[in-house]
């Protein structure tokens, strides 16, 4: 059914600052990738995942996440990784985008049974 003419859509949630935790399955994203390109491709796939989930083209990857992905070498990238995606306001005045996404590594004992969670600002 069509909406009445005077009714307006709600505010887009993409402009809000939000933080969520995700589990990224790198195994399926790196299937068929040559050995010497696996760790670099893993970084690119996480960037692509963050861009899609948060809707911001500006994605920044934390150094601890980079170190974790490279920890077993260029070939043997971990199958799954738990990440925290944080959509934040860009303080830089001359930047092209108002928001950016910061991707940080969340160390967990076991990946099993975890789901996507919203993280409060107090927990960050």
Swiss-Prot record:
Does Ribonucleoprotein count among this protein's keywords? yes
Against Gene3D superfamilies, the record matches this protein to: 3.10.440.10
**UniProt-listed Pfam families:** Ribosomal_L31e
Q: Which GO terms describe its molecular function?
A: structural constituent of ribosome
SUPFAM superfamilies listed in its UniProt record = Ribosomal protein L31e (SSF54575)
Indicate whether Ribosomal protein appears among the record's keywords. yes
* Cellular component per GO, a single term: cytosolic large ribosomal subunit
Q: Which GO terms describe its biological process?
A: cytoplasmic translation
Task: Output the InterPro entries linked to this UniProt entry.
Answer: Ribosomal_eL31 (IPR000054), Ribosomal_eL31_CS (IPR020052), Ribosomal_eL31_dom_sf (IPR023621)
Per the record, the domain of life is: Eukaryota
* Key words, A-Z: Ribonucleoprotein, Ribosomal protein
Concerning its family, UniProt says:
Belongs to the eukaryotic ribosomal protein eL31 family.
Q: What is this protein's record name? A: Large ribosomal subunit protein eL31
The record lists the organism as: Spodoptera frugiperda (Fall armyworm)
């Amino acid at each position: 059914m069509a909406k009445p003419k005077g009714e307006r859509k709600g505010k887009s949630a993409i402009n809000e600052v939000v933080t969520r935790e995700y589990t990224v399955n790198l195994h399926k994203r790196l299937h068929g990738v040559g050995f010497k390109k696996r760790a670099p491709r893993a970084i690119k796939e996480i960037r692509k995942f963050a861009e899609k989930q948060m809707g911001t083209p500006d994605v920044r990857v934390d150094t601890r996440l980079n170190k974790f992905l490279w920890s077993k070498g260029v070939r043997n990238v971990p199958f799954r990784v738990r990440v925290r995606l944080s959509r934040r306001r860009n303080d830089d005045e001359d930047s092209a985008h108002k928001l950016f996404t910061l991707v940080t590594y969340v160390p967990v004992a076991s990946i099993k049974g975890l789901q996507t969670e919203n993280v409060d600002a107090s927990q960050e």
